[in-house]
Amino acid sequence: MTTSLQDGQSAAGRAGAQDSPLAVQVCRVAQGKGDAQDPAQVPGLHALSPASDATRRGAMDRRKAKDLEVQETPSIPNPFPELCCSPLTSVLSAGLFPRSNSRKKQVIKVYSEDETSRALEVPSDVTARDVCQLLILKNHYVDDNSWTLFEHLSHTGVERTVEDHELLTEVLSHWVMEEDNKLYLRKNYAKYEFFKNPMYFFPEHMVSFATEMNGDRSLTQIPQVFLSSNTYPEIHGFLHAKEQGKKSWKKAYFFLRRSGLYFSTKGTSKEPRHLQFFSEFSTSNVYMSLAGKKKHGAPTPYGFCFKPTKAGGPRDLKMLCAEEDQSRMCWVTAIRLLKYGMQLYQNYMHPSQARSACSSQSVSPMRSVSENSLVAMDFSGQKTRVIDNPTEALSVAVEEGLAWRKKGCLRLGNHGSPTAPSQSSAVNMALHRSQPWFHHRISRDEAQQLITRQGPVDGVFLVRDSQSNPRTFVLSMSHGQKIKHFQIIPVEDDGEVFHTLDDGHTKFTDLIQLVEFYQLNKGVLPCKLKHYCARMAV
């Protein structure tokens, strides 16, 4: 009875308020129309307060009554909650499933070194590591943590490594529509190599520690010092810098510190009054120059630059170049460590723990159980046995591979003499072209560029045709941050042609045997062959 009386009073109050000038004035004030007046100064407004309170109490009582009726109704589960049109259910659905609606998809295109491309539809929160993982699984590549995405800016001739944790949507958002920018997938063996062998990346003459740190510091501890929050080494050396708005380059002595990159206005002095700020790296990225001498008139081919994170043209680039590639690698590596810090170390130590967009596309980043359960077996005796020794398993695999190739050569040569020179060379050429490390007819400069792009760490190699000596081959490899070339000489013995690197002391029937031998033995090379350069399609 009380509820009905309150309802009647509130209804009467509403009906009377609709015709009163005071109500019209209050409504205008609430809607922002007319002159804005203080509600306390509107005459007669206090007279409406009791009625409005009664109205609110009546509405609350009605809601409580409805809630009681709902609670008394037997609880029957709804088999189709997504079809329920109740406001309460719609609010719950929106709160329970925000991700499925908010994860927008975006189409990206990734290129390989042979300019083939693949379009991928990825969520907006996908990282560079996620895309690498997806392409590795789709193409059945081996995931050795060296696959890398590169941001290539064609109009300026520069590119950089997209770090594994970076969001691709943020990278692409800084691109300009008119520019021909691309994402490339290729191997970069030097991406985290400085954590393993820092002495190759930080020459002793370019690194100095603070006075309180000098003690027993060695070059092997430089990455740990960079990751420290209270100490840092100082990178210093001569660089050529392009003057803003000019085509000329000026040589100066630079210092890299946590606050940015500085150059000295007076020789090699690092007194504060002689240091001038050049660039910082918190709001900019460091890029490697691919054609600095041709596009920017650089004095050396070992250029790099700073580009603002936000979209900017060629005039916004701060161009630098070093005297040699090892010096450039030192500067770029130190800048990466200062910019990303511990995140870079986490990418190196825990690559599989990064968020993977592959899981959302029903692709597992791990190998299948059947592949992980494979073991090496020996079937040579009366009883089979499992080979537990890894060295023995590797030697057995090599022997089986050699036996398979020998049978293959005999099958290919069954229409003629297997030892005929023409037939043997044709068979060998067919075998060589099937290997990912064989690049056939590429020049010396192209070989050096390919090895440099994939990371000039010790043991990166490829085999190519010799341009100076027909029908011979060249082994190009990296060692000590330098590219070296070794002539593979053909020698004849008892009517058969062999390949050798040491004037016939060690002879091989084909290039596959030669490569496999030097992958296990150093021999006459400066180091073992570890990583091959390959142009793989996506």
From Swiss-Prot:
Residues 54-69 have a biased composition (Basic and acidic residues). Residues 104-190 form the Ras-associating domain. The modification Phosphoserine is found at residues 370, 373. Residues 1-73 are annotated as: Disordered. It is a peripheral membrane protein. GO terms for biological process: cellular response to insulin stimulus; insulin receptor signaling pathway; intracellular signal transduction; negative regulation of insulin receptor signaling pathway; negative regulation of meiotic cell cycle process involved in oocyte maturation. It is found in: Cytoplasm; Endosome membrane. The modification N-acetylthreonine is found at residue 2. InterPro entries: BPS-dom, GRB/APBB1IP, Grb14_SH2, PH-like_dom_sf, PH_APBB1IP, PH_domain, RA_dom, SH2. GO terms for cellular component: cytoplasm; endosome; endosome membrane; intracellular membrane-bounded organelle; plasma membrane. CDD domains: PH_APBB1IP, SH2_Grb14. SUPFAM superfamilies: PH domain-like, SH2 domain, Ubiquitin-like. Keywords: Acetylation, Cytoplasm, Endosome, Membrane, Phosphoprotein, SH2 domain. One of its GO terms (molecular function) is receptor tyrosine kinase binding. Pfam families: BPS (PF08947), PH (PF00169), RA_2 (PF21989), SH2 (PF00017). Phosphorylated on serine residues. Phosphorylated on tyrosine residues by TEK/TIE2. It comes from the Eukaryota. Residues 232-340 form the PH domain. Residues 437-533 form the SH2 domain. Belongs to the GRB7/10/14 family. Adapter protein which modulates coupling of cell surface receptor kinases with specific signaling pathways. Binds to, and suppresses signals from, the activated insulin receptor (INSR). Potent inhibitor of insulin-stimulated MAPK3 phosphorylation. Plays a critical role regulating PDPK1 membrane translocation in response to insulin stimulation and serves as an adapter protein to recruit PDPK1 to activated insulin receptor, thus promoting PKB/AKT1 phosphorylation and transduction of the insulin signal. Interacts with the cytoplasmic domain of the autophosphorylated insulin receptor, through the SH2 domain. Interacts with GRB14 (via BPS domain); this interaction protects the tyrosines in the activation loop on INSR from dephosphorylation. Binds to the ankyrin repeat region of TNKS2 via its N-terminus. Interacts with activated NRAS. Interacts (via SH2 domain) with TEK/TIE2 (tyrosine phosphorylated). The PH domain binds relatively non-specifically and with low affinity to several phosphoinositides, the best binder being PI(3,4,5)P3. This is Growth factor receptor-bound protein 14. It comes from Rattus norvegicus (Rat). The lineage of its organism: Eukaryota, Metazoa, Chordata, Craniata, Vertebrata.
